Amino acid sequence: MDPLGAAKTQWPWRRCLAALLFQLLVAVCFFSYLRVSRDDATGSPRPGLMAVEPVTGAPGGSSRQDTTPTRHTLLILLWTWPFHIPVALSRCSEMAPGTADCHITADRKVYPQADAVIVHHWDIMSNPKSRLPPSPRPQGQRWIWFSLEPPPNCQHLEALDGYFNLTMSYRSDSDIFTPYGWLEPWSGQPAHPPLNLSAKTELVAWAVSNWKPDSARVHYYQSLQAHLKVDVYGRSHKPLPKGTMMETLSRYKFYLAFENSLHPDYITEKLWRNALEAWAVPVVLGPSRSNYERFLPPDPFIHVDDFQSPKDLARYLQELDKDHARYLSYFRWRETLQPRSFSWALDFCKACWKLQQESRYQMVRSIAAWFT
């Protein structure tokens, strides 16, 4: 009886000891979890990834290494400069305040550490398989196919099947939409002076560098100029020095923004820069009017499809030339909107922002099937 009675009196102390040990184990696990969570929240660099200072446009494409430990920032490699011409780059946070930065460089030595590689199609299309980044691809690295050229200027797309994760182009259905231009609201009062009609001393201009006699735009021009004088600039025509281009075009009331290729969303600097930045009313030949109106109000431009013939268009332009009120109606949109044009630096920052928002890893099965 005594041994059993003694055991009963010792049992509560054993239960207390077991409870204390259990609480100690829970506390150790909890504080270990807090430490891991805090480390994750600070964004410690992934092992093997060196932070590289953003390129500020150094012609050699090299980047200075920052030895100060920093929060991991996405590293984007430009496999080539666009058309093999170095361009000035800017901090993405400066281009759009409140956004995050990426490290962007054209230094191929960082290829093994790069989170993404932007491949400009024109620079690799002559022999894609030999000009693409090497295999094996670093784990998790995303490749971005980039082109601002229309399908006829993008050869050998079929050779790229299964290589790319994201598309980046002027097409609005691209993963990364990089148009040639756009309209955006004024942040305050319009910052431009009213249009000076007295400075518009000429009627119609057209600047063309790629003259193809059998193209749709040349055929239309030839029919139009039979009824209306058009000043043509470019190769084999009137010289137009780059330094005086906008000054020259701003003297004209109308500008022929004729695209060299007719494809959806292919609306280039011919409209956004040559016409709108010169304060000339664009006369457009390209995709349908409805396609233009996805990016512009209906009144800033004149579409050739609105007329039965080039002769009818010529007559309309001559009428507007004499009717100042009707001509000025093509500028009302400027009271609330302003035109913007693309830059390579901004396009690369758009890729930066997309990569930060979209972590899903996908594969584009066929660039050719989508783009052509």
Curated annotation (Swiss-Prot):
Regions of this protein lying in the Lumenal compartment: 35-372
Catalytic activities: a beta-D-galactosyl-(1->3)-N-acetyl-beta-D-glucosaminyl derivative + GDP-beta-L-fucose = a beta-D-galactosyl-(1->3)-[alpha-L-fucosyl-(1->4)]-N-acetyl-beta-D-glucosaminyl derivative + GDP + H(+); an N-acetyl-alpha-neuraminyl-(2->3)-beta-D-galactosyl-(1->4)-N-acetyl-beta-D-glucosaminyl derivative + GDP-beta-L-fucose = an alpha-Neu5Ac-(2->3)-beta-D-Gal-(1->4)-[alpha-L-Fuc-(1->3)]-beta-D-GlcNAc derivative + GDP + H(+); a beta-D-galactosyl-(1->4)-N-acetyl-beta-D-glucosaminyl derivative + GDP-beta-L-fucose = a beta-D-galactosyl-(1->4)-[alpha-L-fucosyl-(1->3)]-N-acetyl-beta-D-glucosaminyl derivative + GDP + H(+); an alpha-Neu5Ac-(2->3)-beta-D-Gal-(1->4)-beta-D-GlcNAc-(1->3)-beta-D-Gal-(1->4)-[alpha-L-Fuc-(1->3)]-beta-D-GlcNAc derivative + GDP-beta-L-fucose = an alpha-Neu5Ac-(2->3)-beta-D-Gal-(1->4)-[alpha-L-Fuc-(1->3)]-beta-D-GlcNAc-(1->3)-beta-D-Gal-(1->4)-[alpha-L-Fuc-(1->3)]-beta-D-GlcNAc derivative + GDP + H(+)
Record PTM: Glycosylated.
Cytoplasmic side: 1-15
Keywords for this protein: Glycoprotein, Glycosyltransferase, Golgi apparatus, Lipid metabolism, Membrane, Signal-anchor, Transferase, Transmembrane, Transmembrane helix
Highest taxon of the lineage: Eukaryota
Transmembrane segments: 16-34
InterPro entries given in the database record: Glyco_tran_10_C, Glyco_tran_10_N, Glyco_trans_10, GT10-like_C_sf
Subcellular location: Golgi apparatus, Golgi stack membrane
EC number, UniProt record: 2.4.1.65, 2.4.1.152, 2.4.1.-
UniProt GO MF annotations: 3-galactosyl-N-acetylglucosaminide 4-alpha-L-fucosyltransferase activity; 4-galactosyl-N-acetylglucosaminide 3-alpha-L-fucosyltransferase activity
Lipid bilayer topology: Single-pass type II membrane protein
GO biological process: fucosylation; lipid metabolic process; oligosaccharide metabolic process; positive regulation of cell-cell adhesion; protein N-linked glycosylation; protein O-linked glycosylation; regulation of cell migration; regulation of cell population proliferation
GO cellular component, one term: Golgi cisterna membrane
Gene3D superfamilies on file: Glycosyl transferase family 10, C-terminal domain
Residues carrying covalently attached carbohydrate according to the record: N165, N196
Enzyme class: transferase
Record-stated family: Belongs to the glycosyltransferase 10 family.
Cited PANTHER family: 3-GALACTOSYL-N-ACETYLGLUCOSAMINIDE 4-ALPHA-L-FUCOSYLTRANSFERASE FUT3 (PTHR11929:SF165), ALPHA- 1,3 -FUCOSYLTRANSFERASE (PTHR11929)
Purpose of the protein: Catalyzes the transfer of L-fucose, from a guanosine diphosphate-beta-L-fucose, to both the subterminal N-acetyl glucosamine (GlcNAc) of type 1 chain (beta-D-Gal-(1->3)-beta-D-GlcNAc) glycolipids and oligosaccharides via an alpha(1,4) linkage, and the subterminal glucose (Glc) or GlcNAc of type 2 chain (beta-D-Gal-(1->4)-beta-D-GlcNAc) oligosaccharides via an alpha(1,3) linkage, independently of the presence of terminal alpha-L-fucosyl-(1,2) moieties on the terminal galactose of these acceptors and participates in the blood groups Lewis determination and expression of Lewis a (Le(a)), lewis b (Le(b)), Lewis x/SSEA-1 (Le(x)) and lewis y (Le(y)) antigens.
Name of the protein in question: 3-galactosyl-N-acetylglucosaminide 4-alpha-L-fucosyltransferase FUT3
